[in-house]
């Protein structure tokens, strides 16, 4: 996947289009990510044991194709590429400013 946990992203499409947030959880097998304060849905929870039931607001997962990384160097949404750095490690690279993405 082109984004990882902790990356700042912008939502490209849907009702949350244009919203920015940080990735809380990455689900590579399902190709989905959970972004903080984006795609809030209401979840109905039954009371179990000590926990009280009710309606909770939680962040639902978005498909990874609906988000784009915001480059930490240039601050713009951009696609990412890969290259091998001087130490022989594979790193992500911003396609706009050609800077390494941590």
UniProtKB/Swiss-Prot annotation:
Q: Which GO terms describe its cellular component?
A: ribonucleoprotein complex; ribosome
SUPFAM superfamilies (UniProt xref): Translation proteins SH3-like domain
The record's GO molecular-function terms, alphabetically, read: rRNA binding; structural constituent of ribosome
Q: Pfam families per the record?
A: KOW, ribosomal_L24
> Which Gene3D superfamilies does this one have?
2.30.30.30
Q: Name one GO biological process term.
A: translation
Q: Which InterPro entries match?
A: KOW, Rib_uL2_dom2, Ribosomal_uL24, Ribosomal_uL24_CS, Ribosomal_uL24_KOW, Translation_prot_SH3-like_sf
- The answer to whether UniProt assigns keyword 4Fe-4S to this entry is no
Q: Which family does it belong to?
A: Belongs to the universal ribosomal protein uL24 family.
| Its biological purpose | One of two assembly initiator proteins, it binds directly to the 5'-end of the 23S rRNA, where it nucleates assembly of the 50S subunit.
- Whom does it interact with, and what assembly results? Part of the 50S ribosomal subunit.
Spell out the protein name for this chain: Large ribosomal subunit protein uL24
Identify the species of origin. Herpetosiphon aurantiacus (strain ATCC 23779 / DSM 785 / 114-95)
What gene name is listed for this protein? Answer: rplX
